[in-house]
């Protein structure tokens, strides 16, 4: 049988990213401190932060189009009328806006200020929607999905997509 599937080409551009740490030769030759490990760790953190920012908020100019970009980014997100106006219903709508095959392993992405607001959300019986991890390595969840924080996610404000889910 014939299917309705179609394919098209997408150009994935490469973008340059660099960082620099000045280290003296004296410090490099110091055997007491693992400077190479430290520098390597710092490179990883810096580049990781820049990539996280670009993949979330990038505008397509010398960086990828981020998932929060107004054109080419995510079509659906939690947007509110104002500060502290997120509702449980909006979160449920966001979860079910994602197709079922992708929903099971999806996570919420938000900043710490938004986490603080979500932790205060309650259901009709006064029970918190937020579920802290029961064991040491268990993640916190809301509506059964893990929460990931990013300093690059916008805060809750009128028109901002302050929560991503996917």
Feature roles, as predicted:
Residues 1-166:
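Structured, hydrophobic secondary-structure cores that serve as assembly/anchoring elements
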């Amino acid at each position: 049988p014939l299917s309705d599937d179609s394919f098209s080409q997408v150009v994935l551009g490469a973008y340059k990213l660099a960082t620099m740490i000045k280290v003296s030769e004296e410090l490099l030759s110091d055997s007491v401190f693992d400077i190479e490990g430290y520098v390597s760790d710092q490179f990883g953190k810096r580049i990781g932060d820049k990539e996280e920012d670009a993949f979330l908020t990038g505008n397509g100019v010398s960086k990828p189009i981020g998932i929060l970009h107004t054109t080419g980014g995510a079509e659906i997100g939690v947007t509110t009328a104002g500060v502290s106006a997120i509702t449980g219903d909006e979160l449920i709508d966001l979860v079910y806006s994602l197709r079922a095959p992708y929903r099971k392993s999806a996570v919420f992405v938000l900043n710490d200020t938004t986490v603080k607001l979500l932790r205060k959300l309650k259901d009709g019986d006064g029970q918190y929607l937020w579920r802290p991890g029961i064991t040491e390595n268990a993640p916190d969840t809301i509506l059964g999905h893990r929460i990931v924080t990013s300093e690059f996610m916008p805060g809750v404000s009128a028109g901002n997509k302050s929560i991503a889910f996917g």
